[in-house]
UniProtKB/Swiss-Prot annotation:
This is Choline transporter-like protein 5-A. Residues 247-249, 330-334, 379-443, 520-593, 654-699 are cytoplasmic. One of its GO terms (biological process) is choline transport. It catalyses: choline(out) + n H(+)(in) = choline(in) + n H(+)(out). Choline/H+ antiporter. One of its GO terms (molecular function) is transmembrane transporter activity. It is a multi-pass membrane protein. It comes from Danio rerio (Zebrafish). Residues 42-225, 271-308, 356-357, 465-498, 615-632 are extracellular. InterPro entries: Choline_transptr-like. Glycans are attached at N120, N173, N180. The keyword rRNA-binding does not apply.
Amino acid sequence: EPRKFDPTFRGPVYNRGCTDVLCCVLFVIVILGYIALGTVAWIHGDPRKVIYPTDSTGQFCGQKGTPNAKKAILFYFNILKCASPAVLINLQCPTTQMCVSKCPDRFATYTDMQLLYRFNKSHWDYYKQFCKPGFNNPQKSVAQVLRDEDCPSMIVPSRPFLQRCFPDFITRNGTLTVANKTAFKDALDTARSVTELRDAANGITSIHEAKEVGMKIVEDYASCWYWIVIGLFIALVISLIFILLLRFTAGFLLWFIIFAVILLVAYGIWHCYWEFAVLRETPGADVTISDIGFQTDLHVYLQLSQTWLVFMVTLGLTEASIVLMLIFLRKRVRIAIALLREGSRAISYIMSALFYPIITFVLLAICISYWAMTALFLASSGDAVYKVASGNPNCKYANQTCSPESFNRTNITKQCPGAQCLFAFYGGESLYHRYIFILQLCNLLVFLWLVNFTIALGQCTVAGAFASYYWARRKPADIPPCPVFSSFSRALRYHTGSLAFGSLILAVVQLIRVILEYLDHKLKGAHNAFARFLLCCLKCCFWCLERFIRFMNRNAYIMIAIYGKNFCTSAREAFYLLMRNVVRVAVLDKVTDFLLFLGKLLIAGSVGVIAFFLFTRKIPIIQEEVPVLNYYCVPLLTVILGSYLIAHSFFSVYAMCVDTLFLCFCEDLERNDGTTAKPFFMSPGLKRILGKAEQSPKKSRG
């Protein structure tokens, strides 16, 4: 039921006790366990297993202080035995793998080498660097060499990629070649096609192209990083100026934002139409995006009329949505602007709240770093596991574990000629190694819990600070000193358990969503329509559930900051308070978020326009200072995204301020009636907008 009038109530309760102590204890135990997990992973893990490729004997390629120190590249004796690039990268190709200092640069076979060796021994000197260390018998028969895999049967021109030698595929006039050849012969004088190499390493060409794009992007970042920093600094300054201007010109500025965004999107529509109209008359520009497929040169897409048509339609739908919202929700927009004006006034009294996101950022950076390092060490835990590799499909010992030291003394080599004991992967049969996957899930769950707790702590801190502003009768005289620090200490001292409780609920739902995404990825190639439909429904339901829990947690933290009760009680009271004001909540909350989103969009868009003219060298004054870029859109998108995130960090405080003031406003309406005996705490401007004028003393007495 609605709260009763309490003449002694003055905002956040100071006399409070610890809440959800059991969850607090559990949270502390989990953190200690998480530290223990990281320690165990650090002891058993070895990042070198991820950083360096490993040869058939389990030795790292390129590791300092070892015989392979100057051999940083992995070479495959017979790449034709490899089924796919995934097999290569997972180091499970059934052929000998050896560390080399460089990849082959020519076609050659062991048979040709033996013939040429009689006349020139330099052929063997070159070929033997791709043979097993210590092998120096070029007279050994081809059959025996291939059986024992002392040397590769052939070598092909290759280049290093992912620290592994892959065939150097080059497309010439639409034909796939290696060293300008489309065919070659192996050691058994069998004709081979370059297509077979491509099939053995399917997808390597596209990956290589992606690598080239990545290298060009890195070059762009290296040459213009300081311009990116300047752009982000401009976004920071604009965001601060924007927040300060809201204090004095909230109404004007917000209406300016609305119409500025409308004009900005309208300009985008006009520019897209102009580009579309020009390209429509250009020969060859009518090709569709699907026809050209993936291109490493991103400028190709900007030469297509369809690209600009897609941009134009997208911006047109955005423009229509904004205009329709303004037409049908203009009254709610006025109320939202009044709330934002009140929020700007509150922030002007508590400016320190704007810098609290720095603390959140530092804590999140620590959480992310610890999770990433723990995941890396867990993934690299385990001992070297060796398995029998045989080219004979009838070998019954194939894929069984083996020991390199005793392999030659077993019967496997007799029953399966040519079989070898090769390194397969890192793992183990101990209890720790068997539950690596479970430990990774635990690592992810605790990471999500800590991230959500960090965000919850920030929300509760900011809510407590702004609640003390709203419930102060005389502003700023009745606002307590250091409201942000006081609210932070209260939240951490008394309500760690409650914040951990709400964060855990959200973390569990997020973990379920991650698992569903993983299952969806695994079932992409499945033909079970019912399973796909069920999975799609579950993903949709849990997405909605996560959004609802986020909304309820946010309001529960506000109630915790004000009344100091446990999580369940605070969530229930917040829910009922919102339900009693459901008409206001349903529209006002989203309208306020929409206005703040427009502000973030305007800041990111404005900085983005400046960055566009800068990176395309269209500003004459500094044209010579700006480097020529391969893909100007990459640093441009970086500046736009970074500007949006910077604006979001400031506006997140603003949004929490408005949500807190709105909840306090709803309580104010229930506690007080505007009479002299029960005056409202809301500002005159907010009362005027809502039509809640003070009642006369005569009416209150009557």
